[in-house]
């Protein structure tokens, strides 16, 4: 519990939001500091000042752990908050949408979810035009409360215990090399601490990383049965891999990348960072309502930038349309 705290000026945490009027007007704000970053208290001070300058009534909780995020978002839901704002990145937002999807439809439809970008990866925030260094503009947009119902992707799989599981995602699922790179960065950062050093260390370890995986995929009427470098299934921009995806058309964009030559691999990274990823001849784009993964031998899987335990056997990735009320720029 050392990484969690609750701040609520009018009442203690155990009594939060007992009054119906207060539940309808006050925001529940969950602050997730960047892992390993300094200045978290200073960053929150700026956010708090901006909220008060804009006349926002709110209660504030903080957590740096996934378990804490889930518990505290569920606390907001159970106590009747109608506006929940995540100050964090893609992973924290993923926890929040999964908590909302665990609630009943009536409860979920009564809640609006907002986002102030503050994570290591803020791809979904950037998709909508929210920027880390434009705090005042972000708060003003959230105050306008312009709501759009958005889709969520969902991966359904069986775990190592034989249990049927599912996980929702707002941005993307990665299978293969990109997930392996994310895993390398997580491991090297745990050892090296610095984001820059972990990035350099990840690049060095890439020399020993396998670059393709035996996969069997079914996308629409196409069956792909061959070695594949990486697959991105995007509900939104997918860190540049599914740049044309939109989270409100009831469909998923899929980029399947075959194994290019080493020089072409570097070209692919260049096109990824310049927003022209689909122009690479090794990238094969699709648009679909469902992806069936019959086989992906030893391919790691990540959901919204966070590693998940590799599914056992075949699994499906699909979309659920207009299930979350999301506050977008006015």
Ranges and model annotations:
Residues 91-105:
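Short Gly/Thr/Asp-enriched flexible loops that form oxyanion-binding sites at enzyme active sites
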Residues 41-43, 97-100, 126-128, 244-245:
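Short amphipathic alpha-helical segments
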Residues 87-89, 118:
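Glycine-rich beta-strand-to-loop/alpha-helix junction loops that act as flexible
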Residues 162, 166-180, 225-234, 239-240, ...:
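Short hydrophobic-aromatic micro-motifs
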Residues 227-279:
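Internal helical hairpin/lid segments
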Residues 54, 102, 106-229:
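Catalytic core of DAGKc-family lipid kinases
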Residues 2-87, 98, 140:
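ATP/NTP phosphate-donor binding region
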Residues 219, 256-330:
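ATP/nucleoside-binding phosphotransfer catalytic cores, i.e., glycine-rich phosphate-binding loops
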């Amino acid at each position: 519990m050392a990484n969690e705290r609750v701040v609520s000026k009018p009442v203690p945490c155990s009594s939060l939001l007992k009054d119906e009027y207060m539940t309808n007007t006050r925001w529940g704000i969950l602050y997730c500091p960047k892992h390993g970053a300094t200045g978290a208290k200073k960053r929150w001070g700026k956010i708090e000042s901006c909220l008060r300058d804009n006349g926002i009534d709110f209660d504030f909780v903080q957590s740096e752990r996934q378990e804490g995020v889930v518990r505290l978002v569920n606390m907001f839901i159970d106590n009747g908050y109608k506006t929940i704002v995540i100050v964090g990145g893609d992973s924290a937002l993923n926890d929040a949408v999964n908590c909302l999807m665990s609630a009943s439809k009536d409860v979920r439809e009564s809640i609006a979810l907002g986002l102030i970008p503050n994570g290591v990866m803020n791809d979904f925030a950037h998709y909508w035009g929210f920027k880390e260094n434009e705090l005042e503009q972000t708060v003003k947009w959230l105050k306008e409360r312009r709501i759009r119902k958005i889709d969520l992707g969902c991966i359904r799989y069986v775990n190592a215990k034989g249990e049927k599981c599912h996980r929702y995602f707002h941005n993307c699922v990665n299978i293969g090399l990109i997930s392996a790179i994310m895993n390398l960065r997580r491991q090297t950062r745990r050892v090296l601490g610095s984001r820059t050093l972990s990035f350099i260390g990840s690049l060095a370890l890439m020399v020993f990383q396998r670059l393709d995986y035996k996969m069997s995929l079914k996308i629409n009427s196409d069956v792909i049965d061959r070695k594949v470098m990486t697959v991105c299934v995007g509900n939104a921009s997918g860190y540049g891999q599914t740049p044309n995806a939109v989270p409100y058309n009831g469909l998923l964009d899929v980029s399947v990348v075959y194994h290019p030559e080493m020089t072409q691999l570097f070209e692919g990274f260049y096109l990824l960072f310049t927003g022209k990823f689909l122009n690479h001849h090794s990238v094969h784009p699709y648009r679909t309502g469902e992806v069936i993964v019959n086989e992906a031998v030893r391919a790691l899987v990540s959901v919204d930038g966070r590693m998940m335990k590799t599914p056992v056997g075949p699994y499906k990735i699909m979309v659920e349309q207009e299930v979350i009320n999301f506050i977008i720029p006015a």
